[in-house]
């Protein structure tokens, strides 16, 4: 009876059941540990299921390993390709960043030239408007003023020759209702009003605003809110009030061309341009010392009796408590 159960059952459950039966004495020890020589059949029966199970398990494990090896190889190859592609992409991005940095550095001088070019453009437009009054065409230069007038009235256009008019004479013709002046000439005369400031003295010197000059000087100075930044504001304000921004700009560029530092160039302006000589610095009203920029704190000094800009006094800070501090460079 016991042997039949052994033939049917196998695995851990059988082992546990046999141990329980042995401990309780329900199965004799001789029925379990049989003699191979005397009972070969029973031994064979007991070992066969174990042998088949072991073989089946081994075969299944080997089959699983065989199935996973190609998949793992594919995953490894794919990851390798992905890493290589990412490395190439990173290298390309780094090269692109370097190119962009180089390009940005190359374009900075052009950006600085933009303001000067804009001023030149305005001056050139005014100059063209002024010369547009000289209504000149190619051809013979024998037409008199009367002949030109007659030709205009008849053909509604200038004759094929030069027709030069003085400004006052042309103004008289435009104001005279009996005289005929082509619309193009009248328009050119009106445009002359915008060129009234363009004279022989300032021709070729493009007008620059106080804001543009301040930005140009700021671009050359390191840091922010320093005593020299404050000096730039004072220079631009006084230069604007005296209509000498172009002169100040020329002095600044000349000092830089001579190899001076931006700070030295600003000091030279206060010493060379006459409007800064023996001029007291402006007074700035503040609530307390904390309103003064941090970068200027170390340059504050007690104000002397008569400070001057050309002696290094940029401005005076007057606080609500009556105390006055001077910004000295």
UniProtKB/Swiss-Prot annotation:
GO terms for molecular function: RNA binding. InterPro entries: Filo_VP35, VP35_IID, VP35_IID_b-sht, VP35_IID_hlx. One of its GO terms (cellular component) is host cell cytoplasm. It comes from Reston ebolavirus (strain Reston-89). Transmembrane segments: none annotated. The keyword Cell membrane does not apply. Belongs to the filoviridae polymerase cofactor VP35 family. Its main location: virion. The interferon inhibitory domain (IID) binds dsRNA. It is found in: Virion; Host cytoplasm. The modification Phosphoserine is found at residues 194, 306. Residues 83-145 are annotated as: Homooligomerization. There is a cross-link at residue 298 (Glycyl lysine isopeptide (Lys-Gly) (interchain with G-Cter in ubiquitin)). One of its GO terms (biological process) is symbiont-mediated suppression of host cytoplasmic pattern recognition receptor signaling pathway via inhibition of TBK1 activity. Homodimer. Homooligomer; via the coiled coil domain. Interacts with nucleoprotein NP and polymerase L; VP35 bridges L and NP and allows the formation of the polymerase complex. Also interacts with VP30; this interaction is regulated by VP30 phosphorylation. Interacts with host IKBKE and TBK1; the interactions lead to inhibition of cellular antiviral response by blocking necessary interactions of IKBKE and TBK1 with their substrate IRF3. Plays an essential role in viral RNA synthesis and also a role in suppressing innate immune signaling. Acts as a polymerase cofactor in the RNA polymerase transcription and replication complexes. Serves as nucleoprotein/NP monomer chaperone prior to the formation of the large oligomeric RNA-bound complexes. Regulates RNA synthesis by modulating NP-RNA interactions and interacting with DYNLL1. VP35-NP interaction controls the switch between RNA-bound NP and free NP and thus the switch between genome replication and genome packaging into the nucleocapsid. Keywords: Coiled coil, Host cytoplasm, Host-virus interaction, Inhibition of host IKBKE by virus, Inhibition of host innate immune response by virus, Inhibition of host IRF7 by virus, Inhibition of host RLR pathway by virus, Inhibition of host TBK1 by virus, Inhibition of host TLR pathway by virus, Interferon antiviral system evasion, Isopeptide bond, Phosphoprotein, RNA-binding, Suppressor of RNA silencing, Transcription, Ubl conjugation, Viral immunoevasion, Viral RNA replication, Virion. Residues 84-112 form a coiled coil. The modification Phosphothreonine is found at residues 195, 199. Pfam families: Filo_VP35. The keyword RNA-binding applies. Phosphorylated by host IKBKE. Phosphorylation contributes to efficient viral replication and transcription. Ubiquitinated by host TRIM6 to facilitate virus replication. It comes from the Viruses. Residues 204-329 form the VP35 IID domain. This is Polymerase cofactor VP35.
């Amino acid at each position: 009876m016991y042997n039949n159960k052994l033939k049917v059952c196998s695995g851990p459950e059988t082992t546990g059941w046999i141990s329980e039966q042995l401990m309780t004495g329900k199965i004799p020890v001789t029925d379990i540990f049989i003699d191979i020589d005397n009972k070969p059949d029973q031994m064979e029966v007991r070992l066969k299921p174990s042998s088949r199970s072991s073989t089946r398990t081994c075969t299944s494990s080997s089959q699983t390993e065989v199935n996973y090896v190609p998949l793992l190889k594919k995953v490894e190859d794919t990851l390798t390709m992905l890493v290589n592609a990412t490395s190439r992409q990173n290298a390309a991005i780094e090269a692109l960043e370097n190119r962009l940095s180089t390009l940005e550095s190359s374009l900075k001088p052009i950006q600085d030239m933009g303001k000067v070019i804009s001023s030149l453009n305005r001056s050139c437009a005014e100059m063209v408007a002024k010369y547009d009054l000289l209504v000149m065409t190619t051809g013979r230069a024998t037409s008199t003023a009367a002949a030109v007038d007659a030709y205009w009235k008849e053909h509604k256009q200038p004759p094929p020759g030069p027709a030069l008019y003085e400004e006052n004479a042309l103004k008289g013709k435009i104001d005279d209702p009996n005289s005929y002046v082509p619309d193009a000439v009248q328009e050119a005369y009106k445009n002359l009003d915008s060129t009234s400031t363009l004279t022989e003295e300032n021709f070729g010197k493009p007008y620059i605003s106080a804001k543009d000059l301040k930005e140009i000087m700021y671009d050359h100075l390191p840091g922010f809110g320093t005593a020299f930044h404050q000096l730039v504001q004072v220079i631009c304000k006084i230069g604007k009030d005296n209509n000498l921004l172009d002169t100040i700009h020329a002095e600044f560029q000349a000092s830089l061309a001579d190899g001076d530092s931006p700070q030295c160039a600003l000091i030279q302006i206060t010493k060379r341009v006459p409007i800064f000589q023996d001029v007291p610095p402006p007074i700035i009203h503040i609530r307390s010392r904390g309103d003064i920029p941090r970068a200027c704190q170390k340059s504050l000094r007690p104000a002397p009796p008569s400070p001057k800009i050309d002696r290094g006094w940029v401005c005076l800070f007057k606080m609500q408590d009556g105390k006055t501090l001077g910004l000295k460079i």
